[in-house]
Amino acid sequence: MAEEFKKRQEELQKLVLEFELQVKNNIDFYYDSEYYERIVKWYIDNHKFKLGLRAIEIALSQHKFSSDLLIQKANILIALQKFSKALISLDKAHSLNPKDENIFILTGQVKIILGHYDDAI
């Protein structure tokens, strides 16, 4: 099991490095939204939020209607303390996927941080 985890981590690291190389060299590329989600999660897990935000912008340029990518964008914006922008991203995600409870939870958390307690409920 530990070996399988290590292998997955190495594959993810390789994917992130490939992505960074393509961005650095301004190479046109396309990834499935799930690959972008994995790349962005790696940046979030490693506290590289600005790089994660860059990755999410590229991902959303290719997958405009992915509520999961918009939620990840909101998570990064929250980590960067850009709460108003996070709410905009969450609002877009909600319009695409109105039943996703993660959107409600994150929206409530951001509204509490902003002191909008009545709106957080």
Language-model-derived ranges and their functions:
Residues 14-20, 30-41, 68:
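Amphipathic alpha-helical repeat scaffolds of TPR domains
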Residues 59, 92-93:
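Canonical positions in the second alpha-helix
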Residues 14-17, 47-53, 80-92, 114-121:
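Structural signature of tandem alpha-helical TPR/SEL1-like repeats
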